[in-house]
Swiss-Prot record:
The modification N-acetylproline is found at residue 2. This is Troponin I, slow skeletal muscle. GO terms for cellular component: troponin complex. Signal peptide: none annotated. Keywords: Acetylation, Actin-binding, Muscle protein, Phosphoprotein. SUPFAM superfamilies: Troponin coil-coiled subunits. Residues 97-118 are annotated as: Involved in binding TNC and actin. The modification Phosphoserine is found at residue 58. Residues 2-48 are annotated as: Involved in binding TNC. InterPro entries: Troponin, Troponin_I, Troponin_sf. The lineage of its organism: Eukaryota, Metazoa, Chordata, Craniata, Vertebrata. Belongs to the troponin I family.
């Protein structure tokens, strides 16, 4: 059954109008939020920083006021430094935790693995631990074959190699090779 393209229920002009209305509303909200932040900033500064009355103060009173203000500035500067250090520490910790989460999820790129030849004994040691002394001799189960018997069964033909080359050349030689390959399997 061929799939029928679904027509949008909203026309393109209507979509565009809705999009522009949404952007206008978002802009209004952003401007309002910005104004609220500025008002909050002014209110906070007016609470924390009292207006200075420097008129009518003597030189010694002005110097005392300056020393007092410098001390307050130093305290605020130390607090700012401490907050920056805490923020930096928290940022590093967040970064480390994000890496741990990625490791746990398995979302990191795995390096290409190389094949490593491991003997059966080494594999068992790795699986069971170093406490267990397990020896797995796989060759013990194999049937032993004596080399001398196999060599005696086949008689070694020693002949002139030139005659063999001449005999095997041409179509007759190929036929002999074909027949020779056929004969051992039929026995």
């Amino acid at each position: 059954m061929p799939e029928v393209e679904r027509k949008s229920k909203i026309t393109a002009s209507r979509k565009l109008m809705l999009k522009s209305l949404m952007l206008a509303k978002a802009k209004e909200c952003w401007e309002q939020e910005h104004e609220e932040r500025e008002a909050e900033k002014v209110r906070y500064l007016s609470e924390r920083i009292p207006t200075l009355q420097t008129r009518g103060l003597s030189l010694s009173a002005l110097q005392d006021l300056c020393r007092e203000l410098h001390a307050k500035v130093e305290v605020v500067d130390e607090e700012r430094y401490d907050i920056e250090a805490k923020c930096l520490h928290n940022t590093r910790e967040i970064k480390d935790l994000k890496l741990k989460v990625l490791d746990l999820r398995g979302k990191f790129k795995r390096p290409p693995l190389r094949r490593v030849r491991v003997s059966a004994d080494a594999m068992l040691r790795a699986l069971l631990g170093s406490k267990h002394k397990v020896s797995m001799d796989l060759r013990a189960n194999l049937k032993s074959v004596k080399k001398e018997d196999t060599e005696k069964e086949r008689p070694v033909e020693v002949g002139d190699w030139r005659k063999n080359v001449e005999a095997m050349s041409g179509m007759e030689g190929r036929k002999k090779m074909f027949d020779a390959a056929k004969s051992p399997t039929s026995q």
